[in-house]
Amino acid sequence: MLLHLHPDNPQPRLLKQIADCLKDGGIIIYPTDTIYGLGCDIHHQKAVERICKIKNVDPQKAQLSFICRDLSHLSDYTKSIDTPLYRMLKTYLPGPYTFILPASKQVPKILKNKKETIGLRIPDNIICQQILDTLDNPILSASLPGDMVEEYTDPEIIFEKFGDTVDLVIDGGTGGMNPSTVIDCTTDEWKIIRQGIAEWEA
């Protein structure tokens, strides 16, 4: 199903429909502040397994990421954040960044790789924020399978290609083509491990 959401003022009825789908273990394709992503409620193991199968990745080897609604929410899923790291995160979030951090016990086991790290995002996107508010759980954030092509910016074409694979495709307008910038914060020396759409300085 393709749902058309207003990018600046998402319809509450549709937000509830999306949250209900996620609570039931559904998989969605949704807009972010970068590219369209595959998502599910992180606490639904079968849904996470389904996304890993679509992506053809082993969750124990892959660096999986999920989105949170704010820094307070994010801090539940990582081990203690010291003051310098907190200040840096506060400077750059919400925004088009994924921060690799040590995973806390709150992170479902299936999402932890052998290093016990997790990628965390807070997208600067109203639809994302309001889905998270309605669901009240983080959402897995994975890129669409295959090569990133220009067609992946158009939700109508995304629906044609993936509509039979997922439960909902959310049309929030034209998406981007560049992914988030990924920063590894698991040591005292933070470093970029993937340069994406946004610049970053420690």
Where are the model-predicted features located?
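Active-site-adjacent structural elements in enzyme catalytic cores
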Residues: 1-202
